[in-house]
């Protein structure tokens, strides 16, 4: 593996624009939940921003990048606030484009999960550490969102749509590909796997088993 490329590779130098699309989508998803919960404008903005940058903050904390990227590059925060404002202002209209928002959300999940995996590889974590770091990077914002909104984290019970599982699989793919390809190629391969798993699960072709105990 090209250690120099891995050391110098950052999201800002790679798919920065796609990263911001993911931030925008995550912010909208968080803000829409706040609107449904009848939060005021401040609450909606906070929930949207936390959802958008929470996963990235976890990623940066796990990989030793301080302060987090969203504080070093305020474009992320401005994008998150824009997404939250759009959701607050046009919540009913945006809800009609659920499939489009889901596509952006999946893109953000794929990018955050795989970038978290790359960061974990850079600091020398093993395969399980890479998978765990990547998964938390992808789903961390959503977990924080649901806890703030007093909801059971959606990733824990939505078996009809692979989400955390897709993030973990994408991170694992990055670990497998990184020794043989450039960081960009490894991330692209992992991201494509995340998108594929999200696609097949939305069509209910793949589900995780659920254990039911007698009442």
Swiss-Prot record:
One of its GO terms (cellular component) is plasma membrane. It is found in: Cell membrane. It is a multi-pass membrane protein. The chain crosses the membrane at residues 15-35, 39-59, 75-95, 101-121, 123-143, 162-182. Keywords: Cell membrane, Membrane, Transmembrane, Transmembrane helix. It comes from the Bacteria. The keyword DNA repair does not apply. InterPro entries: Gly_transporter (IPR005115). Belongs to the UPF0126 family. This is UPF0126 membrane protein DR_2368.
């Amino acid at each position: 593996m090209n250690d120099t490329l891995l050391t110098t590779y950052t999201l800002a130098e790679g798919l920065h624009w796609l990263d911001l699309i993911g931030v925008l989508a995550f912010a909208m998803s968080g803000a829409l939940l706040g609107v449904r919960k009848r939060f005021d404008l401040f609450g909606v903005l906070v929930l949207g921003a936390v959802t958008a940058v929470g996963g990235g903050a976890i990623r940066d904390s796990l990989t030793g990048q301080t302060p987090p990227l969203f504080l070093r590059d305020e474009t992320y925060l401005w994008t998150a606030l824009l997404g939250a404002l759009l959701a607050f202002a046009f919540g009913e209209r945006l809800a009609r484009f659920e499939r489009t928002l889901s596509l952006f959300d999946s893109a953000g999940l794929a990018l955050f999960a795989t970038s978290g995996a790359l960061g974990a590889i850079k600091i020398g974590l093993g395969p399980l550490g890479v998978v765990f770091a990547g998964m938390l990077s992808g789903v961390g914002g959503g977990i924080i969102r649901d806890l703030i909104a007093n909801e059971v984290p959606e990733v824990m019970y939505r078996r009809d749509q692979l989400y955390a599982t897709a993030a973990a699989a994408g991170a694992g793919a990055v670990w497998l590909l990184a020794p043989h390809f450039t960081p960009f190629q490894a991330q692209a391969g992992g991201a494509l796997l995340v998108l594929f798993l999200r696609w097949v699960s939305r069509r209910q072709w793949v589900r995780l088993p659920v254990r039911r105990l007698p009442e």
